[in-house]
Amino acid sequence: MSRTPRVARSLSALRRELDSLRARKATVALVPTMGALHDGHISLVRQAKRRADKVVVSIFVNPTQFAPTEDFGSYPRTWKEDVAKLAAERVDLIWHPDAKAMYPDGFTTRIVPEGPALAGLEDRFRPHFFGGVATVVAKLFAQCRPDVAIFGEKDYQQLRVVTQMARDLDLGVRVVGSRTVRERDGLAMSSRNVYLSADERRVAPTLHRALKELASRLRAGGDMQDALRDGNATITQAGFDLDYLEVRHAETLAPVTQDESGPKRILVAARIGTTRLIDNIAV
């Protein structure tokens, strides 16, 4: 039987709720989200429940990670549906601040990540993005004081940046990645998939198919540049405008060459119509 989770909208209310949990010696997992929850988010919640006694889900559409030309105003907001889904999963607490609670008057501090994880992927096309993400995630960690935080691998560069930040700043939070959840045709689940027209939705799984083919060729020892060239052609011929298709070191996201050892990850970002999609796959 589902029960409606408790909801905190102010920092003082959040601290009262968390103090109550901590008084019972409970471990806490945080699942940061921007709402518009889908099965990918629910998989994060379920992993959180396996890793901690209590689960906090934050729902906050963070304005500082959107550029003026991006979709902050139109980003899907489905509060009632989100609460119902989290109730069905028996989430303990929802942290749902507004922008003034997160960024009160006089707020001026910003975390700007650097390093090989910021080397020409999302940061090249969305230079504002990771400063906004790092700042809001650092705040969420400070506010919620979780033992563990669960992030999806679909946003793989974000996962690596947050992992590095938590380590570098001694935040005391174990960051755990959770595998990408896909539609039956391979499209990575995303809140922005609702923007796709019917025709675009039929084409969208091309991204995942191209990644699988590229990964297969690399595992078989195929030439990396030839495989990337063919993947690029597959994606653009399907009607996408390609931002990047890259093979990177899976942990540092530094560029790699054909003969380098170590784990590798293929990452892609492309636009179809007005919708920008990202995806990635392990080699």
Swiss-Prot record:
Superkingdom of origin organism: Bacteria
Species classification: Bacteria, Pseudomonadati, Pseudomonadota, Alphaproteobacteria, Hyphomicrobiales
SUPFAM superfamilies, A to Z: Nucleotidylyl transferase
Positions that bind beta-alanine: 65
Active site, per annotation: 41
Pfam families the record matches: Pantoate_ligase
Official protein name in the record: Pantothenate synthetase
Gene Ontology cellular-component terms listed: cytosol
Subunit structure: Homodimer.
Function: Catalyzes the condensation of pantoate with beta-alanine in an ATP-dependent reaction via a pantoyl-adenylate intermediate.
